[in-house]
Amino acid sequence: MRRSSNNFADSADGSTTKKLRSITAVLVSLLLPGQLLPGPFLQAQVPPPANQPAPKSAPKLVPGKSDPLILHMLSRFTFGPTPEDIAAVRSLGSHGIDQWFDLQLHPDRIPTSNGDQILTTRLAEFPALELPVDQLLERFPSGAMIRQSANGKLPMPDDPYLFAIYRRHIQMYEDKQAKKEQAQNNPESPKPESPKSESPKSEPAKTEGPQQSPAPAPTQADMELSQAIESATSMNPKPAGVTPKPAASTSAVRPSYADLLVKSVLALPPAQRVHRILFMQPVEYEQFHSSLKPPQKAQLIQDLNPEERELLTDFENPTRTVIEELQAQRLLHDVYSSHQLQEVMTTIWLNHFNVYLHKNEETPYYLVSYERDVIRPLALGNFEDLLIATAESPAMLLYLDNSSSTGPDSIAAEKQKERAAAGKAGKTTPPGLNENYARELMELHTLGVNGGYTQQDVTEVAKVFTGWTVDHPQLGGGFKFDETRHEPGKKLVMGHKIKENGQKEGLELLHILANSPATAHFISQELAVAFVSDNPPPALVNRMAQTFLSSHGEISSVLRTMLHSNEFWAPDAMQAKIKTPLEYVVSAARASGADITNSQPLINALNQMGMPLYACVPPTGYSDKADAWVSTGELVNRMNFALSLATNHFNGIKSQWTTASQPASTPAEAEQNLEARLIPLGVSEKTRAAVLDQAQPKPPAGPQSQPQLFPPTGDHPEKRPDAKGVSAQNTAQENQNAQIAGLLLGSPEFQRK
């Protein structure tokens, strides 16, 4: 899968960007203010009478009349309904809602879909994400791994390709340290010249390595490159007495070493190409890399297998490779997986048990396992199991600093006191008691901010979890209980006496918290906000909490209670939620049926909209309420994204809007077809009129015809391999439909669920 750092209109030129802004401004002024801002439509519903019995099943479906019910359910329990989803629920008969929901609660029973097959193919591009954390860190070394290898604390890898990767990053680290030292010693000295200006024949830094990894012998391409350089420098001798042209003029005709190097490398077969790059000397690689043009970068990796592509990205930036693959797989799961409820709940729990991506150098690597092995498998299971798994997760232990927490009266602390008294204290002292995890465990993970605990309870909980740490985190180790750092003695938490029992103290406390009525209400409130409304009816939350307690925290039972409630199906709950940026981006990709071979534009879109994946700094996670996401700037970003997505301005994401079954020729017909496809519940007359107004052909304003308000699709149909078979009329039709689709995807109705 290709990676790109492109922004929204990454394939558009300057005029295209200006047109994007123009049409966005027009539509935002016409459509959005007041339609998405919180108002009566989003206020809390009046709870039903207390004696109103809760239904035992979801509403029955009536052929031809139940699509609004199906769409409401799918809009809440998936990342946006697709025609395939709607047809699947219809096919299940009158009890289709309950049957579909039961299947979603048991993902292993769901038949493999076309989307699942696409997902499997896309995920195969990321073999690194299947590795355990320790192997992932070895294969894609973090900065700490490189520093330890440079300092001789870790051995260099035996694998010749990995050795080359480590050698490059060690050299980069040592160069950076040398520059820093030089700057400190000579603060007024001029900066050293860039390595790019040096000759490719300059002496490389010497790095010892395994004997089986010598520098490769020159390939045939290398010899041809040398011959080309010699030929270029010796051709056309000048007659005596003739003044030669200036060097700059000569270089304009003569190919540079770097250009010849790029051409020779690109001409190699895939495996040899990777080998040649990995064993370049630093200066040569810098020249090669800086001379690559965008088309050549695509050519460089287009026929490599996944392992070869990962080797090259590892050579450039190992941690960035892990982060990009982690973010890409998340979006691909959300877009393509048929296990939609599991993916929605995975997002909810990743946000509930938030871990910040950039906490330290190891966190990106641990997040791979955190999502893969902790959150997704338990997303529909038992809450206590999920709570324990997150508490023991290295990602959480590192993020909230519990891995460094040491009891003040622990064995480790007492030994440190003895060493200090004897004048033998080490350079570092135990960090002491850390209350971060204890506080967030009660406030954010279980009881809630008004859960009835005190600061003294926080301190006692912190003592319970002393010794819960990570075994050599810089090497990717797992959970470890360190008895020497655990605080001895009994603890008293909210009236519960916890006897001294080592690691089991923490398990006992987690059981108490997971089965607390306060936790049941807090989790039920959060789920009701996510699936019903920003201000869910208290009666519904109370019933969900009762189910939570009676089922001992079975998440599936709580969700069923919500599905079977009158409040979930109330008319004022329909379309009452505003999509978060993640929900909006993914639902647009699903609705468009986009073929995604490069997820980076979607990742960039989320960054632009203020919801970067895994990058919420505070432990609270992102808000699920409208007031956090509805603003003029946010709506402009969404409209820009919708237009860019629909008109194929994103590299590696393609949509098709004109089909043989819907050959609409007028804007009105196209709008009708696309509205039924993208927003089956329909749009308002105001929205429809605004869309058609922008889609209508505009007469010339003067002697020279005005350019289109919105440009044609960004992949230039005339340059496609099949351009000869594409008529100008069909191209114009596709452009018109793409523009209309983009306007609908940016409409207020599409931004609701």
Which role does the model predict for each range below?
Residues 1-20:
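N-terminal secretory signal peptides that target proteins for export/translocation
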Residues 47-64, 71-85, 103, 111, ...:
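Flexible, low-complexity segments enriched for small/polar residues
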Residues 60-68, 77-80, 84, 91-95, ...:
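Soluble non-cytosolic domains of exported or imported proteins
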